[in-house]
Amino acid sequence: MAEAETRLVIFDCDGVLVDSEPISVSVLVKAMNDLDVPITEEEVYGRFLGRSLATVIETMKTEYNVHPGQEFLEQIRTDLYTRFRRELKPMAGIAETIDTLGIPCCVASSSQVERIRLSLTVTGLIDRLPDIFSATMVKHGKPAPDLFLHAAHEMNVEPANCVVVEDSPAGIEAAKAAGMRVFAFTGGSHANFSGYRAELDRLSPEAVFDAMPDLIHLVRKHKQDGMHL
């Protein structure tokens, strides 16, 4: 059966548009360790990649009996934003890829809108991606489909006509649950942590790629496939 034509590309932000995961994980691990939560960067990658900070906090409460207050959130925000402004880089080739795709694009991320906008501004992508959707806008974050369905609705595109570009297992699950095709991007600096690629393969995305310009061919291939309905 032929696929529906691709009319919208939905990008995750962290680890897809910007190479932020190593910075984010480093900041989170330090903040958790400061509260005597014995967790490593490897564990954070495996358990929380692509998930919201609310999920992290709930895990701290239920598994470690640690109840972080507002100061925990402020520490993360301050440390993260400082390092983003100093260190954050766009994913190699992403600006040119967006310019070449020739179809509407938007961002759907587990992060707060303020953080997404900062990431895109620091890396020079904000003007290319003005349509931003955050997990704070929906009841359930990834791996639930709510965020991607909300983005598609707001962009006036049916789920079947959307392609999601994700780097996390939770994001891939969310895209599939939303009835969208999903391409797994493995070109971020975090892609070599133990078990990462095997977990992505287990979830069977429509494609796996590690160089952002390859997305142009993948989207055009699926766009052409859809035109033969």
Which positions does each model-derived feature cover?
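Short beta->alpha linker loops
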Residues: 23, 48, 52, 75, ...
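Metal-dependent phosphoesterase signature
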Residues: 38, 58-96
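Short helix-capping segments at alpha-helix termini
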Residues: 34-38, 64-68, 124-128, 156-157
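Helix-loop "lid/cap" segments that line or gate small-molecule binding pockets
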Residues: 31-32, 52-66, 119, 152, ...
